[in-house]
Amino acid sequence: MSSVLPTPVLPTPGKNINRGHFPDDFIFGAGTSSYQIEGAAREGGRGPSIWDTFTHTHPELIQDGSNGDTAVNSYNLYKEDIKIVKLMGLDAYRFSISWPRILPGGSINAGINQEGIKYYNNLIDELLANDIVPYVTLFHWDVPQALQDQYDGFLSDKIVDDFRDFAELCFWEFGDRVKNWITINEPQSYSDFFGVAYDTPPKAHALKASRLLVPTTVARPSKPARVFASTADPGTTTADQVYKVGHNLLLAHAAALKVYRDNFQDTQEGTFGMALVTQWMKPLNENNPADVEAASRAFDFKFGWFMQPLITGEYPKSMRQSLGPRLREFTRDQKKLLIGSYDYVGVNYYTATYVSSARPPNDNKAIFHTDGNFYTTDCKDGVLIGPLAGPAWLNIVPEGIYRCLQEIKAKYNNPVIYITENGVYEVNDTTKTLSEARVDTTRVDYLQDHLSYVLKARQQGVRVQGYFVWSLMDNWELRAGYTSRFGLIHVDYYNNFARYPKDSAIWFRNAFHKRLRIHVNKRPQEDDGAFDTPRKRLKK
């Protein structure tokens, strides 16, 4: 049985960390994404996305067979959700715009959905009316099914123009009020879905929108969606397609920035970045040069893949050496667009892994990454790199966020950074009472410890300027459905999606409320007891 490494000594201030330890202009917020929270899949003129097709066609590949048809109904409860953000005293709220809600047919030529425009205008206006800054993601993986049908989505160069047009429409409609944009969320994760993960879209790239019948919304989220019989081959993908998708994501990002800087920058004065996922790639044997090199190579395949082109217009050397002609070249004009196409870097960090150049002895769980020629594992000599948050994948390693920030500073010219996602999940235990379900000590500890390491990185010169918890509320998790909960706010999936603050939400409010900008030991005024009452629902 695996044991766990002892918890490292936390940097000061450790468990007492709060807003006063950070500069006044440091941004604290929480994030969500459209498909995971909005629901209203067939309301307001929205068209289907690849996730709609996938979850209805392959419910067996979602852990509980559910889908995002209703998600957590934020489309209809957005004012309540914004009230929560205000009660918590957060500076900012990160959300994504649903491409098929704005452009149901995917392209401008197929028509603009004014109801979708109105929804996001209302959301943005409500945020600003409550002194909350919007941070808006343009693409959080919900490709319009229409574009997947027409030309296989991001497998085709054609999507670059359609994404540019979608982005331009968003700048035109919302850019007078939105000053902080994230073009693409986790392009590495999305690209890898083509060749690594068989159980996610765009596995469904061969499925046509005509097969997305309009089923009745699932009444109880734990029940699977209806299954529609089909003889269509869902299709498989090659490893080369992973890099083609990544290439087009980078070009789409650059095209969106070009249209903004050419047409909107002078009047709107917005800032841009991509949200890139990272892990601490810890050498299995730090005294073995081959393992150290393998860990560096793993970081390139995870983070450098999308960061290096923004610096030099080239992919990381280790990727070029490993992949050769399988990795496409950028043209001279494309390099010009890519270099410097960011104002800040979004960093999504959750966990860490060991990396080795050879298969670790007596480790049957080690995963070999063929293209990068390295192994990853969460275990060394029978000891886990960090405790597991649940049954899979998220080992809790707070030091890892510090190590990643230091590596980004050293390798990529010390860019301005926002932690755009950081959080931990608990398993959705349906046997717990509401009061029990809202006790999330693991999350409080996780956030305290990671924020302490973020502060340490800042004190050592890393230019971190903001931190967003993932996520504001429990939501429909991609692949996991309703089986895991990432939220500061508990959502009752079975009783009209009622929202209740967890212990972590109350802790975060008391430690990081915007009123605490001046004094380390100051607490927010208890102006709204409803939030601090442990068993009271947050009202509309």
From Swiss-Prot:
Pfam family, one: Glyco_hydro_1
Subcellular location: Cytoplasm, Cytosol
Originating organism: Carapichea ipecacuanha (Ipecac)
Domain of life: Eukaryota
Job description of the protein: Beta-glucosidase catalyzing deglucosylation on N-deacetylisoipecoside and N-deacetylipecoside.
Enzyme Commission number(s) from the entry: 3.2.1.-
Predominant cellular place of this UniProt entry's protein: cytoplasm
One of the GO BP terms on file: isoquinoline alkaloid biosynthetic process
Family under the similarity heading: Belongs to the glycosyl hydrolase 1 family.
InterPro entries in alphabetical order: Glyco_hydro_1, Glyco_hydro_1_N_CS, Glycoside_hydrolase_SF
Keywords: Alkaloid metabolism, Cytoplasm, Glycosidase, Hydrolase
MF-aspect GO terms: beta-glucosidase activity
Name assigned to this protein: Ipecac alkaloid beta-glucosidase 9
Chain positions of site Controls the gate shape and acceptance of substrates: 393
Pathway where it operates: Alkaloid biosynthesis
Active-site residues per Swiss-Prot or TrEMBL entry: 186, 421
Cellular component, GO annotation: cytosol
Annotated a beta-D-glucoside binding sites: 36, 140, 185-186, 350, 421, 470, 486
Reaction(s) catalysed by this chain's protein: deacetylipecoside + H2O = deacetylipecoside aglycone + D-glucose; deacetylisoipecoside + H2O = deacetylisoipecoside aglycone + D-glucose
